[in-house]
């Protein structure tokens, strides 16, 4: 997974500096070059990158995705699909890239209103629809997990026509929750 990371938080900018001479496209190009001149990556190795379905200017993100493919990436892992706009941008990506790229849509269950608000406000690249955040109000842990499963299954179903598969992100080490999600997705 060739990624360059998130922007440095404002509070840490005096101590930590951004590195601009390298980006994920150059990293992918370098990784592919390790196979040797004119050779493909040995199977089963492949280079993937990130695709932010929630980018403010998605046309720029889509152009970068095309550049990533030109520099040796085979596909993308998306940010979690938690909004109708993310699904629309996933569709737009599939239409633009066709079968040239594998796309694995991210599925991450939201488990509480606090979790949803944190993801929306503090995690770069994730957008949780306000309607989803509101639905978690007043729910206990069990109810929150059940709603999280429902939202995740609906997100996966909406993303399925445009994705080659999914990758799952486990919230708060809740393995049993993920087992239930996998069972529902089968």
Summary of predicted features, one role per range:
Residues 11-22, 74-79:
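Flexible, glycine/proline-enriched loop segments at strand-loop-helix junctions
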Residues 1-2, 74-84, 146, 167-170:
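Catalytic beta/alpha-barrel core
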Residues 69-70, 95, 159-160:
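Non-catalytic positions within long, well-ordered alpha-helices that form the structural scaffold/packing
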Residues 5-7, 18-40, 50-55, 97-155, ...:
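Active-site pocket-lining/capping segments in soluble small-molecule metabolic enzymes
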Residues 12-14, 58-60, 88-89, 114-123, ...:
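Short, well-ordered secondary-structure micro-motifs
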Residues 168-186:
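C-terminal/domain-terminus segments
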Residues 68, 72, 105, 166:
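Conserved, mostly hydrophobic/aromatic
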Residues 57-68, 148-158:
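Short, acidic/polar
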């Amino acid at each position: 997974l060739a990624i360059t990371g998130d922007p440095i938080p404002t509070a840490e900018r005096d101590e930590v500096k951004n590195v601009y001479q390298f980006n994920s496209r150059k990293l992918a190009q370098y990784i592919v070059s390790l196979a040797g001149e004119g050779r493909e990556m040995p199977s089963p190795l492949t280079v993937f990158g990130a695709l932010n379905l929630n980018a403010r200017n998605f046309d720029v993100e889509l152009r970068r995705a095309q550049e990533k493919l030109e520099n040796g990436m085979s596909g993308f892992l998306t940010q979690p699909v938690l909004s109708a706009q993310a699904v629309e941008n996933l569709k737009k990506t599939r239409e633009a890239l066709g079968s040239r790229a594998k796309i694995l849509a991210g599925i991450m269950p939201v488990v509480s209103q606090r979790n949803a608000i944190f993801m929306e406000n503090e995690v770069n690249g994730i957008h949780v629809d306000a309607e989803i955040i509101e639905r978690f109000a007043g729910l206990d842990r069990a109810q929150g997990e059940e709603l999280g499963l429902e939202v995740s299954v609906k997100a996966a179903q909406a993303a399925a026509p445009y994705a080659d598969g999914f990758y799952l992100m486990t919230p708060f080490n809740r393995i049993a929750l993920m087992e239930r999600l996998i069972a529902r997705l089968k």
